[in-house]
Amino acid sequence: MKKNILLLSLFIGLSSIAQDATRHFFYLGESKVKDMDVFRKNFPVQDAFTRKMNEGIMNNRVAHISETGSLYILSFIDGDENLGKYIANRATNNNKFREANPKIAEEMSNNTDGAWRRSTWIMINALEFLPADYKMENYNFRKIVMRTVPANEQEAFEKQQLQQHELGLKIGVKYLSVTWKAVDGYPTNTYMTILPDNSILDFYTHYADRQQKRYNSKEFNDSMKTGVKSNITRIDHLSRVY
């Protein structure tokens, strides 16, 4: 019953978002563990099982640890139908994993420190700034910025983000990023921008250069004084675990 309610609320939320030919999602699980070494030992087994059970449904999966000790496990899915299948089958697949790997499942459960928070996010296609050959496994670091915007100004916010990116390119500011919007699990006026790089050192070396170029541009600074005001709710630095 709870699963049906979740799916219903999810697709009601999706129905309010403009339809694209293929929509891109990720399903996010957040929690903490007591011992990262135990997680590192067991997660590859659980990950391989999850990939096998979701073959043809899930495109990719990646786990990160944040500087605050939180786990971020992201499962990437293309298309509404596949998203529905993934969510509908998740509990059943977890039960099958426990049956097939009881010792590992118990270790992982006992190692969890707190409840899991689960959420679903949809890519804002116009705010994807990644190369055609991008592979997430080639980048071991990600900065995430979560923010909320007024519910009635989301479209204006997305246009503003695109304009600022294009203005940045004019002054030589280049970086990788992709912005996602919450569908379920967070307020639906929440956006998450993910900025991948090779390492936190590389990211902030490049960041300092970008900030200097922005600081020197009157046009860019003027653009920041107007438009939709957003409220940053979280900044985190993620290191790839697996």
What are these regions (language model features)?
Residues 18-242:
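Short S/T/G/P-rich N-terminal loop/turn motif that feeds into the first structured element of a domain
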